[in-house]
Amino acid sequence: MSLWPYADSSYTPPQKQYEEVSLDDDITLTGHSIVKYRFRGIEHETTSWVEMYTEVLKELHNGNKAYLNYLADADDSVDLSIQVTRSPDEFSSSVKIDDDIYIWTGTATQYKVNLLRKFFEQYKQDPSDLVFFLDDSKGIGSDEEIER
């Protein structure tokens, strides 16, 4: 018994479409799952809001190392200074950005987004240069997911 041969086809399944939201959009992002982001025209895969937040800050910092160094040494009266420290033990949750520069990451998603807006303003970066790709079909399974 013989079967029909496979037909030649150029069909490719459509790529999954994600909701795109830029940093300058007025939308609450808490509870949304991020799968990737585009910063300065380059797309990056990501597993969490924390990862995106720290990678974007690293890129901003690499362009101008003076600002985060200033914040790390400033007193708490300086806006954003409570987000940056020289010691990883100062925060309950932090990520290393550079030598002796740590960013507080134990915050809610929307708080991170609001901080990015402030950092973009200080770095004179256009907020439309950061676009989030959201996949809400993943759903929210745990408290940890919500905080990410």
Q: Predicted regions span which residues?
A:
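Polyanion-binding interface signature
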Residues: 8-148
